[in-house]
Amino acid sequence: MGIFSIANQHIRFAVKLATAIVLALFVGFHFQLETPRWAVLTAAIVAAGPAFAAGGEPYSGAIRYRGFLRIIGTFIGCIAGLVIIIAMIRAPLLMILVCCIWAGFCTWISSLVRIENSYAWGLAGYTALIIVITIQPEPLLTPQFAVERCSEIVIGIVCAIMADLLFSPRSIKQEVDRELESLLVAQYQLMQLCIKHGDGEVVDKAWGDLVRRTTALQGMRSNLNMESSRWARANRRLKAINTLSLTLITQSCETYLIQNTRPELITDTFREFFDTPVETAQDVHKQLKRLRRVIAWTGERETPVTIYSWVAAATRYQLLKRGVISNTKINATEEEILQGEPEVKVESAERHHAMVNFWRTTLSCILGTLFWLWTGWTSGSGAMVMIAVVTSLAMRLPNPRMVAIDFIYGTLAALPLGLLYFLVIIPNTQQSMLLLCISLAVLGFFLGIEVQKRRLGSMGALASTINIIVLDNPMTFHFSQFLDSALGQIVGCVLAFTVILLVRDKSRDRTGRVLLNQFVSAAVSAMTTNVARRKENHLPALYQQLFLLMNKFPGDLPKFRLALTMIIAHQRLRDAPIPVNEDLSAFHRQMRRTADHVISARSDDKRRRYFGQLLEELEIYQEKLRIWQAPPQVTEPVNRLAGMLHKYQHALTDS
């Protein structure tokens, strides 16, 4: 496919984006808004953002959800801007500096919350800065400007949603159904690999792919939830399926690890049974029926606990899968599965990374302020706005540098494109609303195609071009003002990129160490006799951390294996029949406190000291288990955990 070719699957969204822009433009001028540009810009960003992220037409609900986030972020930013102006109107410089800190604070929060919700906080940060900068000549008009901005943005969002609904958005339901079938087959094939106990690298690749696919399925669930309320039952089932899928991965990998020391536990009966290849979900269904008969015949005591647990989880997965596909009423058996353990939310391991993002945003905004005041440039304010936009949006993504480069390319492309519209097209079409709408529809159509291809600079070019062409009421054509705006955008993006390069993010290793220590803490916390604590479901949170570890350290198999071993230890200890008495309960609390100290330690010396203390406590705990005559189901996993911590103590404590 050529660089300028248009694929059939890209046309519908390109028309949708063009429609959203035209609707926003028409409504903006019809209601005599002072700056319809904001409505058009909002419609374009809300519609194109999810398409750029997805690399194609976004699924139903994505545009609507992004629109709601933009409304929330705008209102938070407007309120914050009003509060800052009211409190500091007599000290303009201090007011702008506080706004810079506010933008950094919002970036810090956006780095810690869920990635899909971080957009609202990033927007809240730079919205307040836009308001404070814009009202500098006439501060008394602040409330009016805030209300107008909110109104224009809401109009733009409504237009984007209307265009989305008009062109029958894609439903993700069929993709979810197909993935559920395919995922079950992949789970069975992973168990086959683990029972064969073949090449470790092949097994590592297989479970790593399954972790990614399960995480992707969770993302699909979020999209389905946004799509329509009629999928509420499917959403509940998918949430439980996420835990079941992770349980299947854990039991398969534990089956592999058990054979490293005790291969005789997996009998020939099960080895022969899992030799049968499967290709479809129907094949897996037949095999599971046979497997349940084999277990009923051999008895639970003669069946390895990992295989028994795996079959139970796969059966529940299969039952819920049928419910998701048919979206029928939840029956009593399903309700019993869905009334599972409460999920545990873990503290973010990226606090240092979030603080780096805070300083990047704050310093870049302050640098823009100094540049504006020092040069006295009329478009210094525009440069400041672009700095805030780039840093607020780039920091929450895995590669901020590439986002900044995308904005630089986009603003450079917007200069000649905007020049064409400013000098030729808009002056010749402003007398006719129809011609003006057609001209902007053409812009939206072709850039909509490029956005879906994720062309570098396409998203930045769309936003920057709309931002600099004259879409005010009334239209005024001052070339110097246009040139200042275009150059201000470019300078702002370059300054933001410079700060991102200068303020290095060296938090990767620290984040990795914190993640590994959180796995250790989770394994230690599983040693408890508290009934409520034992019922807590840590599995989704642990695998979410594992997924983050895989993204931070791609290809680092020793780290992944260590993390997976800790997850397996947690699951095994969680179900272990630990003797119930006050002596052990008190010692469990002591070990949890020590594990928390390991995570929160600021220096390597403190971390080593607390980790050494944890190892000593594990030795004492094993002695206590012998005194209280704990069964092998308890002593063996505790012994394995202590051995793992001794083996990897340097990786878990040293920077």
Curated annotation (Swiss-Prot):
GO BP terms in the entry: carboxylic acid transport
Keyword flag Transmembrane helix: yes
GO molecular function: transmembrane transporter activity
Induction: Positively coregulated with aaeA and aaeX by AaeR.
Keywords: Cell inner membrane, Cell membrane, Membrane, Transmembrane, Transmembrane helix, Transport
GO cellular component: plasma membrane
Topology of this chain in the membrane: Multi-pass membrane protein
Compartments reported by the entry: Cell inner membrane
Any matching Pfam family: FUSC
Main subcellular location of this protein, as a coarse class: membrane
Spans traversing the lipid bilayer: 13-33, 38-58, 69-89, 93-113, 121-141, 152-172, 370-390, 407-427, 431-451, 459-479, 482-502
InterPro entries: PHBA_efflux_AaeB/fusaric-R, PHBA_efflux_pump_AaeB
HAMAP family attached to this UniProt entry: AaeB
Protein name in the entry: p-hydroxybenzoic acid efflux pump subunit AaeB
